[in-house]
């Protein structure tokens, strides 16, 4: 989609197309270079901003984005945990006219960082929400984020979803300034398996 958008822009606005090529290059560079499983919140938001700039060129005035981030909020987030939620809101959060309004909010709540993505679309289908919580969902993006959050922070700390015909809000909470960054449970199991094999 990004390349198709840039191709269309090339004909009408070559200078803008060059800017988008640089943005796309930056987007992929971040994806390749950020091999850590935890990133700073600001690094994660920068990656999301690159993605949104490309989508803005595609949807133009039909895409409105609001960003509300509490000042001096310091925390680590799982790498690329936010982008799938934003992408889902952009792709599926259009209203009946095709307009898309996406709100990204990050605030401290009860000693945690609450990160949410909201849209004004027509709601997430009930079967998608049920599938997410039962582990039988077909949606890859939300399901992967839900599983990653539970793997890192525990079974009770996955995605939360509020949805209606007036829009949806998907959110999660993570610790502020953790003294020790948690290791995903699947990585712990892999390390234990390796240690057991090395003792034989």
What are these regions (language model features)?
Residues 1-162, 166-171:
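Two-component histidine phosphotransfer core
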């Amino acid at each position: 989609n990004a390349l198709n958008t840039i191709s269309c822009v090339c004909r009408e606005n070559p200078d803008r197309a060059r800017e988008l090529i640089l943005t796309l290059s930056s987007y992929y560079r971040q994806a390749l270079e950020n091999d850590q499983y935890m990133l700073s919140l600001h690094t994660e938001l920068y990656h999301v901003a690159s993605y949104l700039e490309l989508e803005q060129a595609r949807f133009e005035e039909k895409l409105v984005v609001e960003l509300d981030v509490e000042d001096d909020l310091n925390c680590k987030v799982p790498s690329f945990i936010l982008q799938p939620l934003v992408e889902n809101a952009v792709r599926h959060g259009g209203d009946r006219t095709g307009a898309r309004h996406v709100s990204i909010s990050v605030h401290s709540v009860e000693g945690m960082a609450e990160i949410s993505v909201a849209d004004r679309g027509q709601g997430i289908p009930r079967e998608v929400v049920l599938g997410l919580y039962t582990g039988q969902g077909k949606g890859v993006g939300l399901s992967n984020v839900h599983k990653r959050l539970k793997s890192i922070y525990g079974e009770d700390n996955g995605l939360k979803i509020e949805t209606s015909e007036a829009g949806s809000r998907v959110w999660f909470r993570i610790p502020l300034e953790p003294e020790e960054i948690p290791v995903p449970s699947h990585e712990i199991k892999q390390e234990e398996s390796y240690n057991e094999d090395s003792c034989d």
